[in-house]
Amino acid sequence: MAEKKLIAILQRHGSTLLNENNSFRSRMDPPLDKQGISQAEKAAENILNEGFKVKKIISSPLLRAVQTADIIADELGLDVEQNRGLISWDLGFLSGKNKDEYDEILNYFVDNPKSKVPEGESLDDLEARTFEFFNEEMKNDDLKVYVTHTSNVITVENLIHGNHDGRPESGETSVEPGGTVGVYVDSEGKYSTEVLFGVEEDATFGS
């Protein structure tokens, strides 16, 4: 079996009230709730105790991600850099809507990745900026923690597996709020992901 190296840590932000309400978060900007703060603190503890040689923490500019990143940064003694390359998929008019009630509408835009969500962006837009961001990031070997959102984690998975048809139905890795996913590359140049910490859940867009 080819040896593999951890090259990136994808950290999902902690939970917010909108998570509890089963709403599409997208570009809405709620703070972490009490559970979300605890999840971020646990993630920070896990990353520290594992002894990962983290050089930098980069966060989506949305508050829930920045708060998560700040908690981890305090534990690791690092600063946080914000980058819009990690911001959530802009779901436009779907933002704040209940997932169960609007799931079929979201799936239309997932199944038709070139179609822009009204007042938002297309899935292709999300994939393009995610690829551009990580393509630039992978030009150096520093291990970094990227604090981001479910849709971004799924998009990284899709890029790794060459799945460009939208639906995350190929066994992609996703975790509950506060969970941590590792991105690896082996000696043959093959990329993979695995859950480092947290509870795995079905991968669904819209977080």
Identify the residue ranges that each predicted region occupies.
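Generic beta-sheet signal
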Residues: 8, 140-151
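Short, active-site-adjacent cap segments at secondary-structure transitions
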Residues: 17, 64-66, 88, 152-155
